[in-house]
UniProtKB/Swiss-Prot annotation:
Organism the protein comes from: Haemophilus influenzae (strain ATCC 51907 / DSM 11121 / KW20 / Rd)
Protein name: Uncharacterized protein HI_1479
Gene3D superfamilies membership: Homeodomain-like
Stored SUPFAM superfamilies: Homeodomain-like
Amino acid sequence: MSNITLNENAMLYLKADYYRPEMPTFKACYFRLSKIAQEQGWGTLPNLAQTKALFKAAVPEIIWTREAFKRANTQKKHAHKATPYLEQVM
């Protein structure tokens, strides 16, 4: 994977998009990036898996882990809120 690179501006855009308060998925950020990269002339992007690997390598593990923990807790809260409604429906 040493010969696979991501334009510096593309990486900055990806970081800014991914760490928004709305917490979009990496896949959604990648597809937004692919449109912007084409418009800005940032070159061809690696595929989704390669881009994610480059992103993980560029971001300190503590940040990546912290964000994953936040996302898991947020998803758990939303699931918990739906439980009373589901119990009423069933």
